[in-house]
């Protein structure tokens, strides 16, 4: 298999998350487009959208190593939908969000955050030396 994977652990249990395939990336965008019709100001719908889209992304990732894979014949979408329901019913929202983030990293959908050590001048966003428009004068 060509897909990258990463172990996700929580409360002594673990699952393997997989990178999304090219087809799954397309299906994810199509799924987001279907859910896109959230009205502005409808916070309940926005929260529901966020949880469902995260669970769907995680379900697509889990599908590669899930016992349901291949159980519906050629209907992978039905298998992913069952896994999505399982995720939404048994996972806390914090874990769904963490898994979604890891899948997006594995799949190259977001760039990894790189923590670079900063010098004391950069920490405060202040220049190391004062900048002026004047030419430096010779030292007397």
From Swiss-Prot:
Region Disordered: start-end pairs: 114-140
One Pfam family named in its UniProt record: Phage_TAC_2
UniProt GO BP: viral tail assembly; viral translational frameshifting
DNA damage recorded as keyword: no
Cellular component annotations (GO), alphabetically ordered: host cell cytoplasm
Location in or out of the cell: Host cytoplasm
Main subcellular localisation: host cell
Domain of life assignment: Viruses
Assigned keywords, A-Z: Host cytoplasm, Late protein, Viral release from host cell, Viral tail assembly
Role description: Promotes tail assembly by creating a scaffold for the tail tube proteins. Tail assembly proteins G and GT probably wrap the linear tape measure protein to create a tail assembly scaffold. This allows the polymerization of the tail tube protein, during which G and GT are released, therefore they are absent in the mature virion. The tail assembly protein GT is produced by a rare -1 ribosomal frameshift. The ratio of translated G/GT is about 20, and this ratio is important for proper tail assembly.
Similarity comment: Belongs to the lambda-like tail assembly protein family.
Subunit and interaction comment: Interacts with the tail assembly protein GT and the tape measure protein.
Protein name: Tail assembly protein G
């Amino acid at each position: 298999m060509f897909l990258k994977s990463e172990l996700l652990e929580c409360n002594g249990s673990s699952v393997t998350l997989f990178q999304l395939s090219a087809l799954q990336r397309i299906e994810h965008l199509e799924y987001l487009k279907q859910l896109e019709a959230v009205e502005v100001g409808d916070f309940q719908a926005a929260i529901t959208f966020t949880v469902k889209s995260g669970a769907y992304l995680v379900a697509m990732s889990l599908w590669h190593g899930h016992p349901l894979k291949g159980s519906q014949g050629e209907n992978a979408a039905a298998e992913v939908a069952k896994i999505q329901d399982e995720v939404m019913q048994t996972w806390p929202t914090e874990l769904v969000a963490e898994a979604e983030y890891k899948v997006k990293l594995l799949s190259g959908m977001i760039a990894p955050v790189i923590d670079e050590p900063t010098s004391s001048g950069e920490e405060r966003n202040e220049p190391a030396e004062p900048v002026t428009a004047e030419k430096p004068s010779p030292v007397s």
